[in-house]
Regions:
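Charged, amphipathic alpha-helical oligomerization/scaffolding segments
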Residues: 27, 31-38, 113-116, 120-123, ...
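Long, amphipathic alpha-helical stalk/connector segments used for oligomerization, subunit docking
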Residues: 86, 92-135
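Long, polar/charge-rich, low-hydrophobicity segments
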Residues: 48, 119, 126, 169-172
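Conserved small/polar residues in nucleotide/adenosyl-binding loops
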Residues: 179-181
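Extended, well-ordered alpha-helical segments in internal regulatory regions
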Residues: 146-165
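Short, glycine/acidic-rich hinge or "gate" loops at secondary-structure transitions
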Residues: 1-9, 44-55, 167
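Alpha-helix capping/hinge segments and adjacent helical runs
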Residues: 15-99, 172-176
Length: 181
């Protein structure tokens, strides 16, 4: 098949989505690995000590989830890749776009909770970046990245729930389980 040149609008759209992919990839890899590890760990706990030693499916799942972090890069490497999107305001800008998207009336409470969390996240980012202290930023980097990730994922779940009731319960459980920042 013959490729055609992109129109200026298509190039601009491609550039926008390439930037989003660059920003969201470390969030997806880091948070996905952490969620997998936590779920596998919880699975093993129901079996007590034998969950580590016997041939339960959770033993394999635990090994697989641990190795995922190695294949994808450790969570700390993902934080290093993501922190620049925190400090440049890229995540906050995207969060603000999500805040302005309409949601189903029954999900407005979740959206408001996420808006409140985003406001506190923005205050934390401002306080830490204005300190101009690299050690402080390094110390807080993982927390800031996780805050952004939870808010973004919450908004994405609320958007999905607005489009289909199939996702409403998941959005409720996820957003309401977040510690209110």
């Amino acid at each position: 098949s013959k490729e055609r040149k992109l129109t200026p609008e298509e190039r601009a759209e491609q550039k926008t989505f390439a930037k989003l992919a660059d920003a969201f990839t470390p969030l997806g890899k880091g948070m996905g690995s952490e969620f997998a590890n936590q779920n596998a760990y919880d699975c093993i706990q129901i079996h007590g000590g034998s969950g580590f030693m016997k041939d339960y499916a959770c033993e394999r799942i635990y090994r697989d989830s641990r190795i995922t972090s190695i294949y994808e890069g450790t969570t700390q490497l993902q934080v290093v890749a993501a922190i620049r999107y925190v400090t440049t305001g890229a995540y906050l800008a995207r969060i603000q776009e999500y805040e302005n998207m309409p949601v189903a009336p029954e999900l407005e409470g979740l959206q408001n909770r996420l808006k409140s969390m985003a406001s506190k996240y923005a205050a934390c980012v401002t306080q830490i970046t204005e300190a101009k202290d690299q050690e402080l930023l390094d110390f807080c980097a993982r927390r800031l990245v996780e805050m952004a990730a939870h808010i973004i994922m919450g908004h994405l779940m609320v958007q999905d729930a607005s489009k289909s009731d199939l996702f409403s319960e998941s959005a409720q459980v996820y957003v309401l389980s977040l510690i209110h920042i």
